[in-house]
């Protein structure tokens, strides 16, 4: 549905920087609440559904837009499929990050990557699309009576704790195309900015199709609540082993919402790679190429430290420890050297996104990673 300007009847689009509706024809600005909304107060709203013939993803746009590039794989293989009426979301977090800011934060992120090729750090943007991703938000009451095992010098003890926790706006993505790995790494969103849904916010952006029912997510909701509950209880108790008994939980409220994500597609050596940016917090994730020889060199350096330097230091410090009885200091220094090298090595690999399973290429369908969602928010 086209949202018209009351001055000239031109199409209105949502301006991220100002948080207002802007007329593309006369450049007039309107507050979101000022725009006439009587035409779409129903529980359903109409979308144009476009499907990608390369990866199978589907996106929904309003009648103002015409999708020609796939936001997921970056290929110009997207075609109109049908007009569809879909459930209207109750809540939305509008885009706070502009297109320019999204590109800038990705460039900054890649420049910090030691293993990232120079050509990738100086990439040219192929596609940069703003997409509202569908989520289910759950309010959950969870209670349990876990018991803990505590070992002391004078014995082995058990004690029990009873506590109730309320989880507010627990996020679960509602798109088959949007893998759990993507959604977990883009979180958390600041739910204080959650607002009532208005169709005006969709103007100028894509929206992913909602295709996962809330009933399908209930088991994952329970698992996530249990993990967070057990972790929090363990932090506040002395026991090292937390044993759940018979947890009770109930969903107090379920809300369908849309959360903002920027999809940036770049090409390197005839392959497409996609980087994602949280449209509210600027958090970045994605997979990019890496320089293999740098990985090999760092690996060999770490190996050299482990095989040559550390044993040498160990011998000297063992002798020092034997003479002075300060073996704790020796162990701490050796351990610190090893951990520092390993932390640098693994940190750079994670920053670069070496995981090839989430690289998008032109000749293959997007793979949904069958990984368990991280249950604890970062």
Q: Where do the language-model regions lie?
A:
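Cys/His-rich metal-chelating microdomains
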Residues: 9-11, 29, 58, 76
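Short, non-ligating residues that shape and space the ligands of small metal-coordination modules
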Residues: 14-15, 32-33, 61-62, 79-80
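Alpha-helical transmembrane segments
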Residues: 337-351
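Residues immediately within or flanking Cys/His clusters that coordinate Zn2+
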Residues: 2-3, 20, 45-49, 67
């Amino acid at each position: 549905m086209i949202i018209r300007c009351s001055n000239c009847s031109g199409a209105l689009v949502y301006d991220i920087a100002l948080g207002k509706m802007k007329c593309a024809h006369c450049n007039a600005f309107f507050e979101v609440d000022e725009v006439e909304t009587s035409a779409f107060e129903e529980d359903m709203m109409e979308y144009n559904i476009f499907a990608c013939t390369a990866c199978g993803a589907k996106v929904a746009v309003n009648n103002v837009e015409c999708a020609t590039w796939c936001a997921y794989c970056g290929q110009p293989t997207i075609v109109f499929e049908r007009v569809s009426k879909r459930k209207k979301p109750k809540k939305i977090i509008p885009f706070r990050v502009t297109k320019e800011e999204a590109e800038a934060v990705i460039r900054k992120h890649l420049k910090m990557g030691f293993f990232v090729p120079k050509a990738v750090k100086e990439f040219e943007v192929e596609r940069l699309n703003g997409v509202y991703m569908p989520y289910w938000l759950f309010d959950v009451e969870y209670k349990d009576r876990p018991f803990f095992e505590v070992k002391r010098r004078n014995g082995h003890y058990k004690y029990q704790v009873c506590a109730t926790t309320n989880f507010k706006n627990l996020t679960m993505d509602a798109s088959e195309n949007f893998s759990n790995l993507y959604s977990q790494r883009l979180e958390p969103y600041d739910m204080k900015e959650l607002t009532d849904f208005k169709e005006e916010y969709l103007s100028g952006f894509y929206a992913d199709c909602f295709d996962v029912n809330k009933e399908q997510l209930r088991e994952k909701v329970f698992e996530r609540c249990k993990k967070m509950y057990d972790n929090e209880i363990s932090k506040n108790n002395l026991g090292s082993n937390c044993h759940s008994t018979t947890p009770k939980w109930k969903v107090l409220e379920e809300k369908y919402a849309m959360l903002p994500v920027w999809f940036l597609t770049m090409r390197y050596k005839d392959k497409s790679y996609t980087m994602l940016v949280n449209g509210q917090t600027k958090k970045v994730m994605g997979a990019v190429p890496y320089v293999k020889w740098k990985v090999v060199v760092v690996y060999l350096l770490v190996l050299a430290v482990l095989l040559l330097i550390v044993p040498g230091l160990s011998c000297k410090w063992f002798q020092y420890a034997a003479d002075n009885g300060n073996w704790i200091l020796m162990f701490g220094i050796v351990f610190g050297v090893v951990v520092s090298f390993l932390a640098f090595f693994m940190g750079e690999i994670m920053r670069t996104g070496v995981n090839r399973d989430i690289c998008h290429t032109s000749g293959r369908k997007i793979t949904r990673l069958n990984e368990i969602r991280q249950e604890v928010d970062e």
